[in-house]
């Protein structure tokens, strides 16, 4: 798969050719996770509607839920104003975080809402 050249032209990548991808749950608005993508991962996501990312540590592509069953169905993909990040609006089946929790953002609250 290759990314549409019109989309590729809008992306700003880091030195490794990557950009960040934020997965947000459609039904709740919760931010579930942040991962990395490159052009190929984005092309696969757009083609299959499955959250597909690039692992920097393993240097390979991975489809969310491929081994765990905790899949992401992608409803929308949006490019941010700077072109260096994408937002995936998803239906999350099971845990989004590799620790087994629904979101990766449930461990440490660094600043809580004022009461």
Swiss-Prot record:
Example of a GO MF term: magnesium ion binding
Cofactor(s) annotated in UniProt: Mg(2+); Zn(2+)
Cellular localization per UniProt: Cytoplasm
Annotated transmembrane regions: none
EC number: 3.5.4.19
Catalytic activity: 1-(5-phospho-beta-D-ribosyl)-5'-AMP + H2O = 1-(5-phospho-beta-D-ribosyl)-5-[(5-phospho-beta-D-ribosylamino)methylideneamino]imidazole-4-carboxamide
Biological pathway: Amino-acid biosynthesis; L-histidine biosynthesis; L-histidine from 5-phospho-alpha-D-ribose 1-diphosphate: step 3/9
GO CC annotation terms, alphabetical: cytoplasm
BP GO annotations: L-histidine biosynthetic process
Positions of Mg(2+) binding: 80, 82, 84
Binding site for Zn(2+): 81, 97, 104
UniProt keyword annotation of Zinc-finger present: no
Cofactor note: Binds 1 Mg(2+) ion per subunit.
The organism's place on the tree of life at top rank: Bacteria
Keywords for this protein: Amino-acid biosynthesis, Cytoplasm, Histidine biosynthesis, Hydrolase, Magnesium, Metal-binding, Zinc
SUPFAM superfamilies referenced in this protein's UniProt entry, alphabetically: HisI-like
Group of enzyme by EC: hydrolase
Family: Belongs to the PRA-CH family.
Subunit structure: Homodimer.
Protein task: Catalyzes the hydrolysis of the adenine ring of phosphoribosyl-AMP.
The protein's name: Phosphoribosyl-AMP cyclohydrolase
């Amino acid at each position: 798969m290759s990314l549409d050249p019109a989309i590729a032209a809008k992306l700003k990548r880091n030195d490794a050719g990557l950009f960040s991808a934020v997965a947000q749950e459609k039904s709740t608005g919760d931010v579930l996770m942040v991962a990395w993508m490159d052009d190929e991962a984005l092309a696969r996501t757009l083609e299959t509607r499955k959250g597909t990312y690039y692992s920097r540590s393993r240097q390979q592509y991975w489809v969310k839920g491929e081994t765990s069953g905790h899949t992401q169905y992608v409803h929308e993909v949006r490019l941010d104003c700077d072109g260096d990040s994408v937002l995936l609006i998803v239906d999350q089946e099971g845990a989004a975080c590799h620790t087994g929790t629904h979101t990766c953002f449930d461990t440490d609250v660094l600043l809580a809402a004022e009461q």
